[in-house]
């Protein structure tokens, strides 16, 4: 019979904790200790692909979570994620990161639920991270894991209000491995480590779009467009450095400039200011198989209207389709204030 290259495992975790007071405006929403469960399916790797050896044999999989936020105004969240598990300290310590979407049962409504300033929409972006001690096969197929879990929900300013919610929790879980016996790990050999990995400088062009709204509730959702051009240099198997420029066409800002000029006549805003912005950025890309994690730090060099400061951050995921084309899902923010969730399509030449 053919030797298996992967095995599967389930885990189910109960969690309970606190909502972090990251903004005084959500104080009225913190009334109890939120709790819930996370159910996950994991595919375990054993080094049959090179990226698995480079990252110390991670798992990848899907998770479903239910969270009771212990406040009728906030409602409950049901979420679905894709996740990776990374292992440290002889595989006793697991770090998991999951990204997906959540459904909120009681979002903001100006008449029936005006106190929910955390969630302006039913669909939210959801992220969770877990740092757990994990011991599999303690009793046959069963094992345990326990530690900290952080759950974050936000709609990325697709619709106001969007104060978002972060929960800091403790979790306790049971693991179940479908296979009694696991394949042997293919070890990282010296040729993997010392083999130089070189690529010439690559040129990237990305078109990004989406909808968003300013923090003024009811001001309306507008489409935005971003053109990004940058060069990247792969410095090793895992990383590339980026340098480039973004041009932002944000229609919500055009509306917001007009709103400031009319509603605050004492301010210097005339309403004629250009809503376009141009930024320069440096970035890093971390490659994990066909996916990559992108982090960028930018500075506006063309900034006619003062909106949330001159520096911006972009963080998100890319998925490559073949050698040249990729899709991207990114969050652009000014420090901790989200501006937009961007859907992008790009080419790397």
Could you tell me what each predicted segment is?
Residues 14-20, 43-45, 64-70, 99-105, ...:
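Transmembrane beta-strands of outer-membrane beta-barrel pores
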